[in-house]
C-alpha cells in the first residue's frame, strides 16, 4: 500500500496502520510493518524506527491529519509524539486476514525455533528438531498471541510441552573460581542451584565446574559477587550441554 499525504508531501510505503477510537472519533498512526510487535514486547525502543511520521491521522490511507482541537478533546494534549505512543501501545493494528495469518505462522515457527534451540530430551540430552517441536505445539493446540514476544511464548510452550513429552531447558556449563576462605561456605549456598557438579579443585582457590538451569544464572552470578565482594569469578563454558544428533519422537 502506498500513501500520499498532502500536508507534508511525504510518500508513505510499507505501512502498518494502528487505530484507536477515542471520544467518538477515530485516530490512526502510520508505522513500519513488523515493528509494532517489537515495540509492544520491548524489543524495539526507538520510536523513530517504528513510526513513519509523528503525525496523527483520522485516515492514514487518505492522508487526512487529525485536527488539533480533536486531539486536545480526546487526549488532553496536542503533543503528537505522546499521542502516537498511546495509540501505538493500546491501539488496534489494522492488517488483512492474509497478513495476519502469515504473521501468526511466522511467529509460530519462531517460537518453535526458540524452544528447539533451548531444550533437550532430559534422558538423552539430545535436542529436538524444529519440525518436531512444531508438531508437538500443534498437538497441544497452542495458539499464538500476536501481542506477546516470541521469547515469552517459548517459555509458556516449554511448560505446556513438559506435561506431554520429555523436554527441559538445556543446562549451561559454568566454572566458578572462588577464594578458599569464602569458597566452602559459598558452595553450600550454591548447591541447591547446581544440577550436576562435574569437577572440584581445591588448591589456592576453589574451582568448580558444574551444570545449571539457565534460569538460575542471574541468581548465581549475584550470589558470587555479593559473597566474595567481587573477588570470585564466573565463566560460562557452554550455553547448552547437549549430545550430538537430533532427538526423535518414538
Curated annotation (Swiss-Prot):
Detected in adult liver, brain, heart, spleen, pancreas, kidney, lung and testis (at protein level). Detected in heart, brain, lung, liver, kidney and testis. Disruption phenotype: Embryonic lethality. Embryos cease to develop prior to 6.5 dpc. Reduced assembly of 60S ribosomes and accumulation of halfmer ribosomes. GO terms for molecular function: microtubule binding; ribosome binding; rRNA binding. The modification N-acetylserine is found at residue 2. Pfam families: SBDS_C, SBDS_domain_II, SBDS_N. GO terms for cellular component: cytosol; nucleolus; nucleoplasm; spindle pole. PROSITE patterns: UPF0023. The modification Phosphoserine is found at residue 238. It is found in: Cytoplasm; Nucleus, Nucleolus; Nucleus, Nucleoplasm; Cytoplasm, Cytoskeleton, Spindle. Its main location: cytoplasm. Coiled coil: none annotated. InterPro entries: Ribosome_mat_SBDS_CS, Ribosome_mat_SBDS_N_sf, Sdo1/SBDS, Sdo1/SBDS-like, SDO1/SBDS_C, SDO1/SBDS_central, Sdo1/SBDS_central_sf, SDO1/SBDS_N. Gene3D superfamilies: 3.30.70.240, Ribosome maturation protein SBDS, N-terminal domain, SBDS protein C-terminal domain, subdomain 1. Keywords: Acetylation, Cytoplasm, Cytoskeleton, Nucleus, Phosphoprotein, Ribosome biogenesis. Associates with the 60S ribosomal subunit. Interacts with NPM1, RPA1 and PRKDC. May interact with NIP7. Found in a complex consisting of the 60S ribosomal subunit, SBDS and EFL1. Interacts with CLN3. NCBIfam families: RNA_SBDS. Belongs to the SDO1/SBDS family. Required for the assembly of mature ribosomes and ribosome biogenesis. Together with EFL1, triggers the GTP-dependent release of EIF6 from 60S pre-ribosomes in the cytoplasm, thereby activating ribosomes for translation competence by allowing 80S ribosome assembly and facilitating EIF6 recycling to the nucleus, where it is required for 60S rRNA processing and nuclear export. Required for normal levels of protein synthesis. May play a role in cellular stress resistance. May play a role in cellular response to DNA damage. May play a role in cell proliferation. This is Ribosome maturation protein SBDS. The gene is Sbds.
